[in-house]
């Protein structure tokens, strides 16, 4: 069986991907929550039996103001992982973000993801970056829209008119697996149908009682709509729309 390393294995997407890879790869998990550190990945790669690294470990969120942590975890750690993968000829699949698109880069988080794409292109050209768009699913990451809705009360800015390509976590995991066999340097992973935040909230409200406060105020660092670079190949999947994805997420 092939062997893969997943960094950020205890995170929202990492846990889902570990389960999905069961039977496909022998998975080595690395996560700071269990004492691991992606920066120290090279000795594992030097053993010569690793087929892939799925690098998901990162400081997340546009609204994250821990700039030193973002620099350390998203930039320096990525440089270490990418250069090690290149040195040992190991396929690198890494999580990028819709915020890496220049039109969407409003924060240090987005800047770090854009840096990763450029660094990989120059120093690990066989890597494939996966631009994830607003991923949601069971056990959502703290601070995301779905998490805030389920743990309300929750303030919805701009009257819920902001537009996103909400993408189900199962589709994101399939795209990461697709990227392992892909020779493209960058791919998009997004539900082709966009929805307003209000539409997403209304769909969640079919399953849970929500405590929402809609305001017309704009949230700093936020974008009305996440622009999609259509010049970047989109992974061909049967993407679930929010009705299907939230049913899988919230149905008991």
Indicate residue ranges for each PLM-predicted region.
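Conserved cofactor-binding/catalytic machinery of classical short-chain dehydrogenase/reductase
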Residues: 52, 77-80, 91, 115-116, ...
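Adenosine-cofactor binding site in Rossmann-like domains, unifying the SAM/SAH pocket
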Residues: 26-45
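NAD(P)H-binding glycine-rich loop region in Rossmannoid oxidoreductase-like domains
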Residues: 41-73, 99-103
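N-terminal Rossmann NAD(P)H-binding glycine-rich loop of SDR-like oxidoreductase domains
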Residues: 4-23
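NAD(P)-dependent short-chain dehydrogenase/reductase
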Residues: 106-110, 114, 118-164, 169-171, ...
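C-terminal substrate-binding subdomain of Rossmann-fold SDR/epimerase-dehydratase oxidoreductases
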Residues: 157-252
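SDR active-site strand-loop-helix element
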Residues: 7, 30, 53-57, 92-98, ...
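Conserved Rossmann-fold NAD(P)-dependent oxidoreductase catalytic core, especially the SDR/UDP-sugar
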Residues: 76-110, 128
């Amino acid at each position: 069986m092939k062997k893969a390393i997943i960094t950020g294995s205890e995170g929202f997407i990492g846990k889902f991907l570990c389960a999905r890879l069961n039977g496909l790869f022998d998975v080595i998990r690395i996560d700071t929550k269990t004492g691991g550190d992606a920066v120290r990945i090279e000795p594992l790669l030097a053993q010569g039996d690793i087929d892939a690294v799925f690098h998901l470990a990162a400081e997340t969120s546009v609204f994250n103001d821990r700039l030193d942590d973002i620099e350390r975890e998203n930039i320096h750690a990525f440089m270490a992982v990418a250069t090690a993968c290149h040195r040992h000829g190991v396929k690198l699949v890494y999580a990028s973000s819709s915020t890496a698109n220049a039109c969407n880069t409003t924060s240090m988080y987005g800047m770090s993801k854009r840096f990763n794409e450029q660094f990989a292109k120059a120093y690990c050209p066989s890597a494939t970056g996966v631009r994830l768009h607003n991923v949601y699913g069971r056990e959502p990451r703290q601070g995301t829209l779905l998490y805030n809705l389920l743990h309300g009360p929750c303030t919805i800015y701009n009257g819920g008119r902001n537009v996103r390509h909400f993408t189900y976590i199962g589709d994101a995991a399939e795209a990461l697996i697709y990227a392992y066999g892909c020779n493209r340097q960058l791919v998009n992973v997004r539900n082709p149908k966009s929805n307003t935040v209000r539409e997403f909230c209304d769909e969640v409200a079919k399953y849970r009682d929500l405590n929402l406060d809609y305001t017309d105020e704009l949230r700093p660092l936020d974008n009305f709509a996440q622009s999609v670079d259509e010049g970047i190949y989109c992974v061909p999947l049967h993407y679930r729309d929010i009705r299907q994805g939230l049913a899988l997420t919230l149905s008991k």
